[in-house]
A protein has these predicted regions:
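Signature of Gram-negative chaperone-usher
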Residues: 2-10, 19-207
Length: 207
């Protein structure tokens, strides 16, 4: 239990109570000679600069924990924080034929105690659209395996891999918002040096 936190909260309540008592004392001491209402008006104009296409990520970090390792390969899994794409533009603000897409690229994993770096090619993902809108025109990218795997997609998150996209921004703009995330997995040789590692995964929105 954080004792200082509760002490601070108690002090705040005491101060509020003292202020309320002071106001009550002044009200009883003075006679009310009438009330006058004042209308408070505000004019909010329409935004003339138009809407925007933007992306946000629900968090600045995620952790990978060991899961599914074998005698030859160590595996660490985690989840990409939810990525939200928002479009507040009207259809006439969107260029004909435009489509937006989100790409991800990772740096190498750097060891906190001077261990050899783990290449970004050892990090893969399996994208997943959470809310693709009513039209279903937002789709996830292909699974990207690691350099420890085989196949044409066994390249890791080395260079701008696709998380999600739509091929027609204008057609779905009225839906306003879409979300996606991805299962992350790091695969290394069993001989990898122990210790803490950190990498930076950059997500970019393009149209």
């Amino acid at each position: 239990v954080n004792r200082h936190k509760f002490l601070a909260r108690g002090a705040a309540v005491s101060t509020a109570a003292a202020l309320l008592l002071g106001v009550a004392g002044m009200a009883m001491a003075d006679q009310n000679h009438g009330d006058q209402d004042v209308d408070v008006n505000v004019g909010i104009t329409e935004v003339v600069d138009g809407g925007v296409l933007a992306m946000s990520v629900a968090g600045t970090a995620t952790a990978l924990t060991e899961d599914g390792s074998t005698p030859a390969v160590r595996q660490f899994k985690g989840t990409l924080p939810t990525v939200t794409v928002t479009d507040t533009r009207s259809p006439d603000e969107i260029p004909a034929g435009a489509g937006w897409y989100v790409l991800g690229t990772s740096t190498d994993f750097v060891g906190g105690a001077g261990q050899p770096a783990i290449s970004a090619s050892h990090l893969g993902w399996a994208p997943r659209v959470i809310d693709g809108g009513g039209s279903g025109q937002v789709t996830e990218g292909d699974r990207v395996d690691t350099s420890m795997d085989s196949g044409s997609n066994a390249v890791g998150l080395v260079d701008q891999e696709l998380l999600a996209l739509t091929q027609d921004s204008g057609a779905i703009a009225s839906e306003g918002q879409w979300t996606a995330n991805a299962d992350l997995f790091l695969r290394t040789p069993a001989t990898v040096a122990p210790g803490n590692y950190v990498a930076k995964l950059t997500l970019s929105l393009f149209e």
